[in-house]
Amino acid sequence: VDYSFFSPPFKDLYTYSDDPRDLSNVTSSDEFYKHFRYLVPELFRVLKNGRLLSMHIMQGTTSIGKDGFLSIIDFRGELIRLFQESGFIFHAEKMIRKNPQLAAVRTKNVQLMHGQTKKDSSINRPGLADYVITFRKPGDNEVKIKNDIDFDLWCKLAEPVWMDINESDVISNFRKAKANKDEKHMTPTQLSVIRNCYLLWSNVGDVCFSPFGGVGSEGCQALKMDRKSINIELKNSYFNMNVHNHKAFDLEKNSVLTLF
């Protein structure tokens, strides 16, 4: 494949299904990494020499109920080391701003609450950003990546922190893929994040691959930008919505308006 973009399960932070094959359905971090280690060499194998792979991730946290203390877990760093072990070169990292007030309302995390500053602000911490970490496979890139990126756009893309990503800029029908019995959390990646990465690190006509295809965010954005899409998805409800969205995007792109 020419480029891979995906958002992996965030260890045991979110559980997406009760399927024992689901990487998010684990009892510990050690169990997650034991299974994830099988995937990384295969990602290295299918990626073309000199090309890139990007992951959309966030840091993990501990909890009082489960761990007995509050702290940040360096999930980002653990993944970087894991991919380097398999031969990948750590190429780039992008931080994405997230609204700490929205996170406080959604998670009810005491560390983000303003009221906690009135009691004991040693407990408080800033909100957590998202990250896109990008790796390069060693070797010469035979087909150079050349897109029409003007100077102003490049200055925006080159910023170390993307401040303007709208957290609601996600594929519109993702909630329809929700399964009643086993759904725990749904976290589609913002389309603008995927678009920026495709623009930087893939050409028109390239094959873009996601091993965690979800409801099709990466794949549909690939089609929209005249790339080709390969997605893998374990969960049936996600897979069915993924197929539906791919077909809908393909139909929309190839439709012709006829005037009579």
Regions found by a protein language model. Give the residues of each.
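Core catalytic lobe of class I
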Residues: V1-M241, L259
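S-adenosyl-L-methionine
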Residues: V243-F260
